[in-house]
Curated annotation (Swiss-Prot):
<dbReference type="InterPro" id="IPR003791">
    <property type="entry name" value="UPF0178"/>
</dbReference>
<protein>
    <recommendedName>
        <fullName>UPF0178 protein BB1267</fullName>
    </recommendedName>
</protein>
<dbReference type="Pfam" id="PF02639">
    <property type="entry name" value="DUF188"/>
</dbReference>
<comment type="similarity">
    <text>Belongs to the UPF0178 family.</text>
</comment>
């Protein structure tokens, strides 16, 4: 299992949680961004800088992630694309995206885009807060626990 992070706008708190999880669970975490990222020295964490451009980081993640991996993103179209490949995905707020939920989330996102394009001021997401941090940490821990149980039961390694 690898964890792929859409890191361009990823909150620092999420990166900290991921660093601790990488050490604890000894799982590779790759931060993908179109800017230079500094990561703590660790055999489990690395950063990949992709060229600037629309969805270049997303394309790298889609090309790299395989079933059994986990993608961390707030980008609903990216989540939909990796879920379509059989890759698990979750948001920075701990929302798990799966085949059953991603279609609805994509429809809602598209509707909001249309409203914005039509001049409707719908605001944006709330600031990332303590409750979001806890929800993400709990969702990530649950995914890692499932992975550990699956591997311990002789199942396919890396299934989230």
């Amino acid at each position: 299992m690898n964890i792929w992070v859409d890191a361009d706008a990823c909150p620092a708190e999420v990166k900290d949680i991921l660093w601790r999880a990488a050490q604890r669970w000894q799982v590779p975490v790759t931060l993908v961004a179109n800017q230079l990222l500094r990561v703590p020295a660790s055999p489990w964490m690395r950063a990949v800088q992709v060229p600037r451009g629309f969805d270049v980081a997303d394309a790298h993640i889609v090309a790299s992630a395989v079933p059994g991996d986990l993608v961390i993103t707030a980008d609903i179209p990216l989540a939909a694309e990796v879920v379509g490949k059989g890759v698990a995905a979750m948001s920075w707020r701990g929302e798990v995206f799966d085949a059953g939920s991603i279609g609805e989330r994509l429809t809602m996102r598209d509707m909001m885009e249309e409203l914005r394009a039509g001049g409707v001021d719908i605001g944006g997401p709330a600031a990332f807060g303590q409750a979001d941090r806890r929800a993400f940490a709990n969702a990530l821990d649950a995914a890692m626990q499932r992975r550990a149980r699956t591997r311990g039961a002789g199942g396919k390694p890396g299934v989230v």
